C-alpha cells in the first residue's frame, strides 16, 4: 500500500520543521480527498504497467488503484493531527468513520457499524461503462486494520492523549470550533480524569496544565502508579 497518501503522511511527520507538512496536506486535500475519504492515488491507472505490478491490475477506483483504502486514511489523520491541522484531521476521520456514514448508507451499502477494507473511489464503476457509479460504495467488511488504526488516530493524535516514556502526554489537535473535551484514561496503575478547555478556539497548543490542582511544567503528566484517580485540567492556547 505504498501510495500517494502514505508518502504524504511520512512527509508530514518527517519534514514538519521545514514547512513541508502544510504543503503536503494542502496537496492531499486538493488531489486525494473526496466526500467519502482519501483515494490512494489520483488519477487511476487505466491499463497494466508491468513495472508497477499489482496496483495497475485493478479496475480504476478499486483497491490499490485509486480506491479509498480506509487503512491509509487513518495514517493521514495521524499526520494531519501531528502537523497541527485539527480541522483537517477530524474532517478525514468523519468521512470514513461508521458513526458518520449513516446518512449515506444507501450509497455505502456495507454494515453501518463496521469499517470495510476499502470504499469505491472517484473512478469506481467506469470499467462497466458508467463513470463513477460505484463511488462511495464500501467493500470487504471487517477485512482491515482500520478500526485499530483509527482508535490510535482519534485517541492519541486528535484527542492527543498518548503514552510517553516519562508519563502521559496531553497534546490535543482538535477542530477549532470545539470548546474543549473530557476523557478518562487508565495509565500505568492510575486513573486520570482529563478536562481540556479551548477558550482561544485553536487547533493545537497547550498553555497550562494542572494535576490535582497543582501546576506542572510542560504537558507530560507524571505516572503516579498509586491506584488512585487524579484530575488533570488542560488549557489550550
Regions found by a protein language model. Give the residues of each.
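Contiguous, well-ordered alpha-helical segments that form the cores/surfaces of helical PPI scaffolds
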Residues: 9-10, 71-78
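Conserved active-site and cofactor/substrate-binding residues in soluble primary-metabolism enzymes
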Residues: 19, 23, 71, 87, ...
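Non-catalytic C-terminal accessory modules of carbohydrate-active enzymes
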Residues: 30-34, 46-49, 57-66, 75-237
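Carboxylate/His-rich catalytic cores and anion/metal-binding grooves
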Residues: 18-37
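Short, surface-exposed loop/turn segments at secondary-structure boundaries that line and modulate
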Residues: 54
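Single conserved hydrophobic/aromatic residue that forms the stacking wall/gate
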Residues: 1-13
Amino acid at each position: 500500500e505504498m501510495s500517494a497518501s502514505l508518502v504524504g503522511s511520512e512527509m508530514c511527520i518527517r519534514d514538519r520543521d521545514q514547512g513541508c507538512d502544510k504543503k503536503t496536506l494542502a496537496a492531499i486535500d486538493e488531489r486525494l480527498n473526496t466526500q467519502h475519504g482519501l483515494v490512494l492515488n489520483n488519477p487511476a491507472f487505466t491499463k497494466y504497467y508491468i513495472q508497477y505490478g499489482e496496483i495497475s491490475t485493478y479496475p480504476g477506483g478499486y483497491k490499490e488503484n485509486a480506491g479509498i483504502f480506509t487503512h491509509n486514511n487513518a495514517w493521514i489523520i495521524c499526520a494531519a493531527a501531528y502537523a497541527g491541522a485539527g480541522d483537517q484531521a477530524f474532517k478525514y476521520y468523519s468521512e470514513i468513520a461508521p458513526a458518520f456514514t449513516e446518512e449515506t448508507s444507501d450509497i455505502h451499502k456495507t454494515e453501518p457499524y463496521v469499517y470495510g477494507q476499502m470504499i469505491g473511489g472517484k473512478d469506481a464503476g467506469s470499467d462497466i461503462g458508467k463513470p463513477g457509479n460505484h463511488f462511495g460504495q464500501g467493500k470487504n467488511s471487517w477485512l482491515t486494520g482500520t478500526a485499530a488504526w483509527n482508535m490510535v488516530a482519534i485517541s492519541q493524535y486528535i484527542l492527543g492523549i498518548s503514552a510517553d516514556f516519562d508519563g502521559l502526554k496531553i497534546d490535543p489537535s482538535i477542530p477549532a470550533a470545539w470548546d474543549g473535551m473530557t476523557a478518562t484514561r487508565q495509565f500505568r496503575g492510575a486513573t486520570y480524569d482529563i478536562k481540556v478547555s479551548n477558550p482561544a478556539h485553536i487547533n493545537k497548543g497547550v498553555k497550562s496544565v494542572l494535576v490535582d490542582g497543582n501546576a506542572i511544567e510542560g504537558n507530560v503528566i507524571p505516572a503516579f502508579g498509586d491506584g488512585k484517580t487524579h484530575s488533570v485540567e488542560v488549557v489550550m492556547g
